[in-house]
UniProtKB/Swiss-Prot annotation:
Source species of the chain: Clostridium tetani (strain Massachusetts / E88)
UniProt entry keywords in alphabetical sequence: Ribonucleoprotein, Ribosomal protein, RNA-binding, rRNA-binding
Gene Ontology BP term (one): translation
InterPro entries (UniProt xref): Ribosomal_bL9, Ribosomal_bL9/RNase_H1_N, Ribosomal_bL9_bac/chp, Ribosomal_bL9_C, Ribosomal_bL9_C_sf, Ribosomal_bL9_N, Ribosomal_bL9_N_sf
Top-level taxon of the source organism: Bacteria
This protein's name: Large ribosomal subunit protein bL9
Example of a GO MF term: structural constituent of ribosome
GO cellular component terms listed in the entry, alphabetical order: ribonucleoprotein complex; ribosome
A Pfam family: Ribosomal_L9_C
Family statement: Belongs to the bacterial ribosomal protein bL9 family.
NCBIfam families, per the entry: L9
Primary role: Binds to the 23S rRNA.
Keyword Lipid biosynthesis: no
Length: 147
């Protein structure tokens, strides 16, 4: 019997796979636990529609990330922080600081973990990489100034 897996099943397959199993295994184990559906024409159409919708959504997210990357490409953020002698900062600039500044200036909500910051402990201008999507990243200039 062919079934469509609704969840990952060990030693059988991943979610949305169409696999061949014995009738008893399907009726007595997979169906009662809602791990699979019978691979009828209507269920296969549902699966195909679902996969198509997911593909379109990923494509839309990718396009949006690329537009955002173009917008941010040549932008400069200015962070004003306290510093001591020789331009050394009290503490350091983190991804959270940059994320907060992006939220203030551009009204963008970018997760701090997606911002790749080297150790910024001095005043100056730094290139910071922002990963917007698995294949899309951009660099912005961050200027650190004394208050």
């Amino acid at each position: 019997m062919k079934v469509i897996l609704l969840k990952d099943v060990k030693k059988l397959g991943k979610k949305d796979d169409v696999v061949n199993v014995s009738d008893g295994y399907a009726r007595n184990f997979l169906f009662p636990r809602k791990l699979a559906l019978e691979a009828k024409e209507s269920n296969l159409n549902l699966l195909n529609n679902k996969k198509e919708a997911e593909r379109k959504q990923k494509l839309a997210e990718l396009e949006e990330a690329q537009k955002l990357a173009e917008e941010l490409k040549n932008q400069e953020l200015i962070l004003k922080v306290k510093s001591g002698d020789n331009g050394k900062l009290f503490g350091s600039i983190t991804g959270k600081d940059i994320s907060d500044e992006l939220k203030k200036k551009f009204k963008l909500d970018i997760d701090r973990r997606k911002i790749n910051v080297e150790n910024i402990r001095q005043l100056g201008v730094y290139d910071v990489e922002i990963k917007l999507y698995p294949e899309v990243s951009t660099k912005i200039k961050v200027k650190i100034e004394d208050i």
